[in-house]
């Protein structure tokens, strides 16, 4: 293969690519490679560019199979018609560790053997795998705690408390609470899974967001009143047209208002404020904003970026005491994302919190 053609093809590729000659020196590198590994890569020994023994061994094997000690055992053979190796490794790139999928392939050249090294960033895959591991671990923990308690109470009921009606009633009440907690968790997990699976499909139903918000406020008014909290809806006396999934948007505002009553009810009032936005830059057009405001104790700023993570809680014990699963705001985030909207969270300790959902404005009436 002609040198000029190789350099031209490598330069056009979007992923980092290096070409190594028979002397194990880099003779071509594209812009993506220099951005990842540093400037002035050409004419350098390959071992000084990518210091990973498995990759270096694969390059040596393809350049000179007869003199190489052995093929790298921890790389998968194949991946190119001319023969090669593939492996997922962690490389050092500009002072940081980067999980990468490396493909090393033979590159026939007019002046002798050469090797092509392709580097694909796999950090996204690694992050997804780790997120899945964390998710499974969190679910296991959340289910194990009430299950362990219930098993303990069952053993007690079969033993010391068998003939104690008062203890039996007390333990059965606790078991009912723990079972309800597990049921809420399972329902939220199913809801989150369903929302995530639908996130790429934008809903097209036309509805009146103002009417929906007022219905949520009415539904939760008795629960709030029992806790000494008043729910008040402000703004937008007329129609508030949006395109959306009525059930999912009801779930969004139900979660937000319920949280405001539970955690911010000390202020005695929760306000739902509906406002029109003439033009939202990120949504590229008119929008509607619904702010759920409480006058409670507020949330420290360091927690705000993580509130929509699965199972993230500001206060684990308090959340569990109030029946929280740690999934409500994650569900809210995904539903709002499906509606091509955004969620804004503002809070100051001692001053309350404001959760604002901003959705693109629809046309016509709901």
Feature-to-residue mapping (PLM):
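Sensory modules in modular signal-transduction proteins
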Residues: 1-33
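Short alpha-helical segment of the dimerization/phosphotransfer core of two-component systems
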Residues: 177-182
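Conserved micro-motifs of the catalytic ATP-binding
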Residues: 197-202, 241-244
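A conserved beta-strand-to-alpha-helix junction within the catalytic ATP-binding
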Residues: 203-218
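Short helix N-cap motif at coil->helix boundaries in the Bergerat
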Residues: 209, 298-306
């Amino acid at each position: 293969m002609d040198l000029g053609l190789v350099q031209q093809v490598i330069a056009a590729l979007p992923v980092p690519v290096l070409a190594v000659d028979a002397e194990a020196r880099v003779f071509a590198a594209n812009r993506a490679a220099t951005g990842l590994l540093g400037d002035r890569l050409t004419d350098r020994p390959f071992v000084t560019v990518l210091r990973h023994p498995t990759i270096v061994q694969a390059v040596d094997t393809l350049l000179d199979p007869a003199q190489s000690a052995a093929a790298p055992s921890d790389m998968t053979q194949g991946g190119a018609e001319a023969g090669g190796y593939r492996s997922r490794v962690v490389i050092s790139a500009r002072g940081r560790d980067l999980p990468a999928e490396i493909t090393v392939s033979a590159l026939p050249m007019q002046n002798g053997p050469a090797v092509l090294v392709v580097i694909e960033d796999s950090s996204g895959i690694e992050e997804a795998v780790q997120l899945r591991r964390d998710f499974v671990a969190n679910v296991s923990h959340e289910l194990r705690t009430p299950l362990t308690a219930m098993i303990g109470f069952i053993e007690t009921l079969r033993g010391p408390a068998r003939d104690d009606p008062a203890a039996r009633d007390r333990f059965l009440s606790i078991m009912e609470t723990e079972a309800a907690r597990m049921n809420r968790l399972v329902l939220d997990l199913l809801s989150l899974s369903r929302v995530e699976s639908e996130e790429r499909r934008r809903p097209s139903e036309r509805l009146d967001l103002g009417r929906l918000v007022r219905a949520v406020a009415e539904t939760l008014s008795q629960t709030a009143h029992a806790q000494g909290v008043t729910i008040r809806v402000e703004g937008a006396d007329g129609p508030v047209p949006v395109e959306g999934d009525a059930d999912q948007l009801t779930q969004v505002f139900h979660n937000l208002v319920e949280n405001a009553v539970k955690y911010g009810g000390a202020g005695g009032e929760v306000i739902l404020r509906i406002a029109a936005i003439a033009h939202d830059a990120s949504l590229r057009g008119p929008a509607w904003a619904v702010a759920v405001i409480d006058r409670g104790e507020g949330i420290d700023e360091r927690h705000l970026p993580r509130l929509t993570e699965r199972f993230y809680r500001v206060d684990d014990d308090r959340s569990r005491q109030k029946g929280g699963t740690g999934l409500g705001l994650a569900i809210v985030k995904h539903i709002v994302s499906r509606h091509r909207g955004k969620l804004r969270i503002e809070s100051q300790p001692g001053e309350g919190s404001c959760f604002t959902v901003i959705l693109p404005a629809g046309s016509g009436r709901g």
